[in-house]
C-alpha cells in the first residue's frame, strides 16, 4: 500500500511539474521532478528535464534583468521591516524635531504603515459557511438532488471549493465547512460509497456517530454533524482540492496575502483622501458582476467533446499528446487561428480526468488490499494485487512522452 501511495504522490508531483513548466517556473518544475523521482525511482523524468533545460537556455539572455528585479524585491523586503512593532515604537519614542519644536510624522506615511483592522471576510462568505454547517447530509451541502450526475457533482464542488478554500475565505468556521465540502465530494463522487450512503442515509449514520453535538436551543437548535457519517474519505479536503485544481491555491498563498495587505493599505489611504471611498470599494464588485453577466451571455456551445456525440462527430488528435477529441463539422472554420488553444484545453481536461480516475483506482486497490489482509484471504489478496490501473498507466505514458 505504501508503494502505491508513493506512486500516486509521484504522479501528482509530475503533474505539478508540468503545470510549472507551462507557467515558466522552471525552479519549481525541477523540485517537483526530483520529488517525483524520489517517491518512485521508476518514474521517467528525462523528457521533462530536457524540456526545462531548453527553457533555461532560451531565457539565459534575460538573467541580468531577473537579477535586478530580484534585487529590487529584496530592497522592498528590507523596507517591510518597518512594519515590525519594535521599530514603530522606536520611531514613536524619537519624534522629529525642527527649530527646537517637536513635530509629528506625516499622516500619510503613518497611514500607509498601519494595518487595517476589522473583519476580512464578506457577509456572503459567512452565510455560505453557516449554510454548510447547518446541512444534514452531503446532497444538501452540494445543493444537488439524489439523482445528480457526476458532472453535476464536480460542477458544484468546483464552484463551492473556490469560494471556501482557507486561503480565500477567512470567515469563522470556514475550515470546518471546507472539510465538510471535501468529504461530501469524496463520498458522492465514488460509486460504491455513494450507494452505501444512499442506502443507510444520514439519519441512520447519525444514530451510530458519537461525535454529533447539540448546538443552540429551542426551535432554533441544530446539530453539528460528523460530516463523515461513517463514510470517511481516504484523502484530506486539501488533497482533494489539489487533485481537482492541481494545487493552485497553496502555491499562490504568500503572494496573494501580500497583494491583499497592499490593497488594504491602499483602500485605507483612499478613504482618508476621498469622501467617495465606500463607493469606490464597490466598483470592483460591480465590475466582477458585469463581467460575469457578459460571460454568461457570450458563452455558447463547447468547442469539443472528449466523447463522440450526435453534434461532435469529427474525430481529431491533439498535436502534442495525441489525445482524441471530437468536434463539429465547422470546427476548422469557426476556430481558425485558435486550434492550438483548444487542443491545450483538451489536454488539460484529459489529464485532469486521468488524475481523478487514477486516484479512484488507487483507492479501490488499497481498499481491496486492506480487506484481504484483514480477512487473511490469499485469494482476495491476489485479486487485489491484480486490480487494473489503466488511468495511472496512461498518466505514466504521458509523463514519459
From Swiss-Prot:
GO cellular component labels: endoplasmic reticulum membrane
Tissues expressing this chain: Expressed in many head neurons, vulva muscles and some tail neurons.
Bias kind Basic and acidic residues: ranges: 70-87
Transmembrane segment boundaries: 279-299
Lumenal compartment residues: 300-401
CDD domains (alphabetical): DnaJ
GO biological process assignments: cellular response to misfolded protein; chaperone cofactor-dependent protein refolding; protein-containing complex assembly
Species name: Caenorhabditis elegans
Keyword annotations from UniProtKB, A to Z: Chaperone, Endoplasmic reticulum, Membrane, Transmembrane, Transmembrane helix
Reported function: Acts as a co-chaperone with Hsp70 required to promote protein folding and trafficking, prevent aggregation of client proteins, and promote unfolded proteins to endoplasmic reticulum-associated degradation (ERAD) pathway. Acts by determining Hsp70's ATPase and polypeptide-binding activities. Can also act as a chaperone that promotes maturation of potassium channel unc-103 by stabilizing nascent channel subunits and assembling them into tetramers.
Major site of localization recorded for this protein: endoplasmic reticulum
Protein name as catalogued: DnaJ homolog subfamily B member 1
Basic residues biased stretches: 88-99
Compartment list: Endoplasmic reticulum membrane
Family that this chain belongs to: Belongs to the DnaJ family. DNAJB12/DNAJB14 subfamily.
Domain J: 137-201
Amino acid at each position: 500500500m505504501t508503494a502505491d501511495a508513493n506512486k500516486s504522490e509521484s504522479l501528482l508531483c509530475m503533474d505539478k511539474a508540468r503545470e510549472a513548466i507551462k507557467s515558466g517556473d522552471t525552479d519549481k518544475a525541477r523540485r517537483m521532478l526530483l520529488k517525483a523521482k524520489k517517491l518512485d525511482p521508476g518514474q521517467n523524468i528525462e523528457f521533462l528535464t530536457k524540456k526545462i533545460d531548453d527553457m533555461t537556455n532560451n531565457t539565459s539572455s534575460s538573467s541580468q534583468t531577473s537579477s535586478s528585479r530580484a534585487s529590487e524585491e529584496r530592497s522592498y523586503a528590507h523596507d517591510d521591516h518597518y512594519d515590525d512593532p519594535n521599530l514603530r515604537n522606536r520611531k514613536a519614542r524619537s519624534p522629529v524635531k525642527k527649530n527646537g519644536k517637536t513635530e509629528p510624522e506625516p499622516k500619510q506615511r503613518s497611514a500607509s504603515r498601519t494595518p487595517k483592522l476589522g473583519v476580512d471576510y464578506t457577509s456572503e462568505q459567512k452565510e455560505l459557511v453557516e449554510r454548510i454547517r447547518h446541512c444534514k447530509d452531503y446532497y444538501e451541502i452540494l445543493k444537488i438532488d439524489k439523482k445528480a450526475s457526476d458532472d453535476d457533482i464536480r460542477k458544484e464542488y468546483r464552484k463551492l471549493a473556490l469560494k471556501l478554500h482557507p486561503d480565500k475565505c477567512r470567515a469563522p468556521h470556514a475550515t470546518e465547512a471546507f472539510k465538510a465540502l471535501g468529504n461530501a465530494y469524496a463520498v458522492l463522487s465514488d460509486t460504491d460509497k455513494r450507494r452505501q450512503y444512499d442506502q443507510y442515509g444520514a439519519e441512520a449514520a447519525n444514530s451510530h456517530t458519537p461525535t454529533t453535538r447539540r448546538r443552540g436551543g429551542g426551535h432554533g437548535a441544530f446539530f453539528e454533524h460528523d460530516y463523515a457519517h461513517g463514510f470517511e474519505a481516504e484523502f484530506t479536503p486539501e488533497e482533494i482540492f489539489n487533485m481537482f485544481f492541481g494545487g493552485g491555491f497553496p502555491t499562490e498563498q504568500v503572494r496573494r496575502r501580500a497583494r491583499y495587505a497592499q490593497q488594504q493599505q491602499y483602500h485605507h489611504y483612499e478613504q482618508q483622501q476621498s469622501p467617495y471611498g465606500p463607493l469606490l470599494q464597490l466598483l470592483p464588485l460591480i465590475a466582477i458582476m458585469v463581467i460575469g453577466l457578459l460571460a454568461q451571455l457570450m458563452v455558447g456551445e463547447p468547442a469539443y467533446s472528449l466523447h463522440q456525440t450526435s453534434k461532435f462527430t469529427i474525430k481529431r488528435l491533439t498535436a502534442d499528446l495525441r489525445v482524441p477529441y471530437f468536434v463539429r463539422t465547422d470546427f476548422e472554420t469557426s476556430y481558425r487561428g485558435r486550434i492550438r488553444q483548444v487542443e491545450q484545453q483538451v489536454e488539460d481536461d484529459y489529464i485532469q480526468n486521468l488524475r481523478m480516475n487514477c486516484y479512484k483506482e488507487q483507492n479501490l486497490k488499497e481498499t481491496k488490499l486492506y480487506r484481504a489482509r484483514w480477512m487473511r484471504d490469499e485469494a482476495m489478496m491476489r485479486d487485489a494485487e491484480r486490480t487494473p490501473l489503466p488511468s495511472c498507466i496512461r498518466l505514466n505514458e504521458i509523463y514519459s512522452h
